[in-house]
């Protein structure tokens, strides 16, 4: 499980320094009336779904601001089920999860776009620890070394960076 670093979460757990930054993405069916959207304005009438307590739900509410309330589900798999059942037009989640959704959970769907990084605070991933855990400083030191040696970038380039061909949806 990946965890985005948020102020709310940081109040109850400790995070390592970020090791990966990603964008939010939009998953739709290719024949959706919203598939050609190039800006968030083109999504105002879309019924969008996201999992509760996620940065994706925050993104829908704070950046896209659709005319109808987003549909909220317990888990991403529930959002996928709603899309498969035709209950929502699309779902918003981070780009790596969007690749998984389109490949496994929502057959025939596409990543219609990724949102500009400037549209909201970056979605930084960090390792999660119980509050006060003494391992945080050790993990941060290891992450700093991996970053300084270029290993984090190498891992990202090999395993996590695929968004170049996905269209950008502007704010």
PLM features: what roles do these ranges have?
Residues 55-71, 110-112, 141-171:
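Ligand-binding clefts/hinges and TM-proximal coupling segments of bilobed small-molecule sensing domains
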Residues 39-54:
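Short loop->beta-strand "edge-of-pocket" segments that line small-molecule binding or catalytic clefts
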Residues 2-11, 61-62, 89-121:
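A ligand-binding cleft/hinge motif common to bilobed small-molecule-binding domains
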Residues 31-39, 71, 132-137:
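Short helix-loop capping/hinge motifs at secondary-structure junctions, enriched
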